[in-house]
Amino acid sequence: MHANWKTWAHVTKLDPDKRLPRGAVEEIATSGTDALMLSGTLNVTRENLQELLDLVSAYGLPLVVEPASPDCAIFDGGIDHLFVPSVLNTNDVRWIVGKHYAWLRQASGIDWEMVVPEAYIVLNPNSAVGRVTGADCSLSTGDVAAFAQVADRYFRFPIVYIEYSGTYGDPAIVQAASEAVENATLYYGGGIRSAEQAAEMGRYADTIVVGNAVYEEGIDVLRATVRAVQ
């Protein structure tokens, strides 16, 4: 039985390319967060992904891998789900379906019960994910709402993910996406570094994702963001 990701209010994102201080993994795992997502854009390899997975797998939290490339699409090591992103607001087809096609051409034994497609709307042009995918981040509130509705109602993505990646986003845009989505679960990630920001985005998103704060602000801030949405 795989973990029920639809019930999560708070997810902590850990980057395989970043180092955590000694003892930090246990503190993160006992912070109250609902799940751990192993994800990064740059310098993520199967080796450093596996190293991080080995560190976190002993704590019993639901584990998600969000692969940056087909090589990192793994199903073993105790993970519960593979969240596979498609970036909707790019003209580079590789990030919409190309890498997914390449993955399926080379893969075998895919456990489709573990695979959860994500419709990403990337909104920080200065972020690694924005640069790498060539995302058009100059979207209006109406543009984002339309993308969210296309993802939800037309393509039937189970997750719509508003990604500001490293910077705190516009709550009005997240609200518009929330109002446009009827069936999908709305994720928000980007720049949450306080309980107030977590609560603000948590009013509109079903699930907030906290990542950089773990490395830059510390465990007390992470715990505060958990309390704000649970």
UniProtKB/Swiss-Prot annotation:
It catalyses: sn-glycerol 1-phosphate + (2E,6E,10E)-geranylgeranyl diphosphate = sn-3-O-(geranylgeranyl)glycerol 1-phosphate + diphosphate. Its cofactor is Mg(2+). Sn-glycerol 1-phosphate binds at K13, Y161, I162, E163, Y164, S165, G166, G191, G211, N212. One of its GO terms (cellular component) is cytoplasm. InterPro entries: GGGP/HepGP_synthase_I, GGGP/HepGP_synthase_sf, GGGP_HepGP_synthase, GGGP_synthase_archaea. Its EC number is 2.5.1.41. GO terms for biological process: glycerophospholipid biosynthetic process. The keyword Magnesium applies. Mg(2+) binds at D15, T41. It is an enzyme of class 2 (transferase). The keyword Nucleotide-binding does not apply. One of its GO terms (molecular function) is magnesium ion binding. Pathway: Membrane lipid metabolism; glycerophospholipid metabolism. Its main location: cytoplasm. It is found in: Cytoplasm. Belongs to the GGGP/HepGP synthase family. Group I subfamily. Prenyltransferase that catalyzes the transfer of the geranylgeranyl moiety of geranylgeranyl diphosphate (GGPP) to the C3 hydroxyl of sn-glycerol-1-phosphate (G1P). This reaction is the first ether-bond-formation step in the biosynthesis of archaeal membrane lipids. NCBIfam families: GGGP-family, GGGPS_Afulg, PRK04169.1-3. This is Geranylgeranylglyceryl phosphate synthase. It comes from Methanoculleus marisnigri (strain ATCC 35101 / DSM 1498 / JR1).
